């Protein structure tokens, strides 16, 4: 029978360095004999303190004194003296603080899952009440979404190598033994697995283990292209609603803890456009709030054009922060969301911890030139003139939502659309296929999510963002001459045909602390076109420029 399930140990397999490697480093530093800590650990035995901590009978902090005593006994038996600064707690704290995800092994698990394998983490673990418990919690939060099942010894009251925990694993997977491969870095944990009839791999180093895993599964795992970042399942997220004023609410999804990061999408999109960024930013230690902007999805879509002026939209976002009790947030925007976040930084700098825009440059209002003059002078913006007459573009875009989104969400080398001569042609989709093919950027499920969202909201609200050019210009002129002095990031996309990188050329004149990121071979839909590259740029910038300073209560 073919293998259809893969089970991974945590320590020494999915997370490195292994505890034994950390012990060896501690032994060297403390001038203890090699293997000393492992011998002391074994003294706890399957019937002693180790079994009690691994099965959740006692916590880590309760177990530490037992390990201290076992170390003292081992030292006496070996005729050595423990250093004065010897501390089991410090050794384990250090080991946990150093532990990182073994990404090649994780990618192998993801590849197998994509090929139809069920995946499971089976780990001997303790109830962690130590000073480093946050590190362990973060590690588990990062790994858990990638696996179908997680079995922790301290949660089920049994631990490896007890055969009962492997039988529980088989029941959980609903698999026969000969359908499962199990990877562990401890040989004694594998013997009962083999006795039950499962395939086993003893992990000494990652490359060798992956070669063995390739061989037994028949799936290529080495030298494979990196898988895209994890996407969001809308049904598995926390959804929230903030009442901005009577009749107007903003919907958002939320993930993570830490400094708040508010994600603002563009046209014609949804919070779902950030589906590859939300988990990555949350795992990096941020509280992510991805908003359905006004007019979209489950947020309110009032019909009045003036409801979508930048002045009103920014006031809405300030109310959004107030209602959530947030004094500041990092604002990251794309397309129209980029315009919004630059204006938040310009008019409400005290509420913006840092600001970043994808594709959309900061373009200060010129009191001497109206925006309509600029748009009319640039043929690539003709579509915006087509959007001005209420009801016209709505009729075209709402006629066949499946066609609409398959036309919009395309890579730069797949596009059917032209943004110039739209009025002359009589519409944005004139000359495009009635049944467009699916772009490589999206799945059919992605398209249907947008279809369902716009069945709720329609296109009037989203198009009203374009119908406030004069109001936005007049408001923007009130900030004429101001500079944006807060931490800022501009991410350009090489192949965005409308928001071309050259448009951001002079931004440093207005934003002296501006940092930049540039993504090659990327079109307009940056978040889904190059999600891994974007996530790397955003996380590096957030870590250096956007961590919240300590705030003292004023009460």
Swiss-Prot record:
Lipid attachment residues per UniProt (S-(15-deoxy-Delta12,14-prostaglandin J2-9-yl)cysteine): 522
UniProt note on regulation of activity = Inhibited by 1-(1-acetylpiperidin-4-yl)-3-(4-(trifl uoromethoxy)phenyl)urea (TPAU), 1-cyclohexyl-3-dodecylurea (CDU), 12-(3-adamantan-1-yl-ureido)-dodecanoic acid (AUDA), 1-((3S, 5S, 7S)-adamantan-1-yl)-3-(5-(2-(2-ethoxyethoxy) ethoxy)pentyl)urea (AEPU), N-adamantyl-N[']-cyclohexyl urea (ACU), 4-(((1S, 4S)-4-(3-((3S, 5S, 7S)-adamantan-1-yl) ureido)cyclohexyl)oxy)benzoic acid (c-AUCB), 4-(((1R, 4R)-4-(3-((3S, 5S, 7S)-adamantan-1-yl)ureido)cyclohexyl)oxy)benzoic acid (t-AUCB), 4-(((1R, 4R)-4-(3-(4(trifluoromethoxy)phenyl)ureido)cyclohexyl)oxy)benzoic acid (t-TAUCB) and to a lesser extent by 8-(3-((3S, 5S, 7S)-adamantan-1-yl)ureido) octanoic acid (AUOA).
Annotated positions of the N6-acetyllysine modification: 43, 191, 215
What ranges does the record give for the region Phosphatase, renumbered to this chain?
1-224
Say which enzyme class the record assigns: hydrolase
Gene3D superfamilies xref list? alpha/beta hydrolase, HAD superfamily/HAD-like, Putative phosphatase, domain 2
| The record's note on its domains | The N-terminal domain has phosphatase activity. The C-terminal domain has epoxide hydrolase activity.
The name under which this protein is listed is Bifunctional epoxide hydrolase 2
Species, as recorded: Sus scrofa
